[in-house]
Amino acid sequence: MKLINQNQVEFFQGSVAYDAGKVFFFESRVFRGIFSDRYAQMYNQFLKEKWIDEIFEAGLVHTVVSDDIKLEGALITLEHKKIPFMTHPAERTPYSFWLSAKTLVRVNLLLSQHGYVLIDAHPWNVMLEKGNPKFIDFTSVYRSNRISRDWFEEFKKYFCIPIWLSSNQWHEFSREYRREHLNGFGLKLFETRFLHKIFSFLMGFGRVIGDPVNFLRQLDKWLDEHRPKKNLSADWPEYPQYEIAQNPLDSVLPKEKFILEVLRAEKPVTVLDCAANKGHYSEIAALLGASVASFNYEEQCVDECLLLAQKKNLDITPVVMDFKLPTPPHSIGLLYGSAYKRFKSEIVIALGLVHHLCIFQRLPVHIFCKICMKYATKGILFEYVDPTDSQVKSWGKQIPDNYSIEGFNSYFNTKFSKSKISKIINDNGSKRVIVYYFS
């Protein structure tokens, strides 16, 4: 057993206010020191229960009492399974967010059958692991035979309202509501007496809150009745992503072969796939052993990627985000980092993207490059689409002066001094090259 001093570890600032314990990071692992005798005894017993694996399978983050690390001053030191990427509630699709609510209720239901409940019910404690929601606030577990009314009010405020909006196909309103933390127009609006009446039917659940199992089953039924309807206002879900080979790692296409060559050589631990569509290149990176954050601005594409991760048990975290508008830091004191911090990865993949942004949408070339470099620590896999490409020519748009392979080289080389370039991909009117920038 290795005893470590508190000065040797990095504490997660968001947990320092809790009496139960403090989350800290050490040697790329996630721990929690428990300093309260009452909580230490409770969690020691909880983790020895014969049904504990059922709770983990339902969605509580997998946790053990560490057998090799002990934090000085802590009565026990827990180790949590590490979640590769932290996500914001507004980065979830309506379906993914609904799954998070279902997971939270399911975990609480199973706990309540064994004399425990959850104290907290907000979405900042639910993350994604291989496409599956995981409730990460282990010290929200508490021995009790009653669900608190505060838990129900928090669940209504942060889960029921945005889910109700999505179930009525008000997807953008739902996402904007989820962007807000403690204050905001949406949160204030739904506190008004008029709109409060919309959710009066939920108040009936309060009559059975003293019977946790019955209460949570009714809440779960409400969620089933309000499963979000698919957002049909999308442009890219039918965009083909190559699946020539049954195994993506066996592809013979020049573009994929170059990408495979780079990823196999570099062996990145983390990868960010920008504008990933349905996640084809995310799958390739994950199959090669990387933890992958995969984002797209269209919800249907992200849901396809989510289902891919679940079906194939891939370490992919699919989120909704616009490349041009990374999620800013949030929470009290901005303790939860921006997208730049949370999705920072060794290699950034930016394929089939630059011409849409820099030519069609007029995003300045230097800003495109700056955004990519903000995420990347080791290198960038970049697809350059030439102005003579048939798709670009069909738009009839003016080409920016610095939109050239030389222009991109000059910007990317400020951080990554070396580069490797593929052969020109010239097929059916396309003219593109893949460049790997690295140091």
For each of these PLM feature ranges, what is it?
Residues 1-119, 129, 162, 166-190:
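Conserved ATP-binding subdomain of kinase catalytic cores across diverse folds
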Residues 117, 122-168:
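Catalytic activation segment of kinase domains across protein kinase-like and atypical kinase folds
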Residues 268-277:
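Conserved class I S-adenosyl-L-methionine
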Residues 278-290:
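Conserved SAM-binding loop of SAM-dependent methyltransferases across substrates and taxa
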Residues 291-296:
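Conserved SAM-binding motif I beta-strand of class I
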Residues 306-342:
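S-adenosyl-L-methionine
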Residues 357-371:
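A short, conserved alpha-helix within the catalytic core of class I
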Residues 374-386:
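Conserved beta-strand signature within the Rossmann-like core of class I S-adenosyl-L-methionine
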